[in-house]
């Protein structure tokens, strides 16, 4: 009798679970298949799809899924997220490690010999809603770390409803920059869902800890010759005590003034914050510029966030009522923007006609975003406690937005058992032989790795090294 009383609710639960994936089944995604992609001299031999996944509430997140060129059925599924917050993951596809890269003419796509879909099925997701082609029916784009993690989780579940043939494949979560927050917060949700075959996560030049990022950046800037002895001496005097320096949230007025100067040198002087040794696209920028009726700003708000003038400046812009466009510093987004706003391309990608133009980053999403976490320590410790996930934090070593030293300090602070001492890792460059590609140290279930000479966008700067690293990560090989 007791069992009989429970049986109808169990049936109802099963029905609800089935209804959640009701549109699924192999072939349900056929309407999203990209049949012809403009810009290619020859259409690809692998399948690719573009459409929408259901996020939380009325959010619809745009995805572009490229199947593996190796063997889709046995290759892992890899989620990729770019950061911002408020910037599009299509930047990763079209300028970093996608199967084809946009050319300067904004029309032509060229095949990428170091594409990550050579060995994996890669899902590029534009997140959160309001970014790129993603939208929300209620047009509410103010969000936070927790909401974004949940919405990305819902979208990932919807992906496996749409592509049930991939449910059993190994799943890896990867991303870059502010995805240093997105990926571990999402992974903590995914690890609790036994229907997903989560195997690991990798974050490139990620924001793992605001404090360690700020503190390390000042050392990075000084020892790369950017600050000079006068400023360095003043920083040591006013920001440090007993061999401990606080460059993150120091309230001492002279220290704050010094850090304003450091922030200007690193982010606003004309140096390329994403690659110290690369030129600044468009030349030395002004802090704010105008394009017709639009104010163009370039600060994504991830370094020295506690400086008071930064907060005042951001709120003034938000209240101004002016039309504001967010354009990351020293980057040229014209080619990708021209391509993705071409009507033929939008039609090929199944983008609704009523959606606004695609931009790399969305100012409103960025400026209204609530940063709930100052560090990802608890998330990584939770993932590491499972003792079954392969985790990689990798950094191009000439990036200043999320510098290698801060992420190395962060990994060290997790206090995991050291398995391989810091050593060079090698890439075979054919005729020039094996070369040192960077340095790696490995702990139990987590590794930290640098890519020599790469900036914030590692696959753009060092594509062969990036693919080699990615392959070793997926295949659980020594780096």
From Swiss-Prot:
Chief place where the protein resides: other
Its Gene Ontology molecular function terms? serine-type carboxypeptidase activity
State the active site. 177, 399, 456
List the record's Gene Ontology CC terms alphabetically.
Answer: lysosome
**Signal peptide annotation:** 1-27
Subcellular location(s): the record lists:
Lysosome
Disulfide bond positions: 87-361, 239-255, 240-245, 280-330
What are the EC numbers?
A: 3.4.16.5
Q: Which reaction does it catalyse?
A: Release of a C-terminal amino acid with broad specificity
- Alphabetically ordered keywords of this record: Carboxypeptidase, Disulfide bond, Glycoprotein, Hydrolase, Lysosome, Protease, Signal, Zymogen
UniProt subunit comment: Heterodimer of a 32 kDa chain and a 20 kDa chain; disulfide-linked.
Q: What does this protein do?
A: Protective protein appears to be essential for both the activity of beta-galactosidase and neuraminidase, it associates with these enzymes and exerts a protective function necessary for their stability and activity. This protein is also a carboxypeptidase and can deamidate tachykinins.
* Family (UniProt): Belongs to the peptidase S10 family.
What name has this protein been given in UniProt?
A: Lysosomal protective protein
Natural source organism: Bos taurus
Classification from the root reads: Eukaryota, Metazoa, Chordata, Craniata, Vertebrata
Q: Gene behind this chain?
A: CTSA
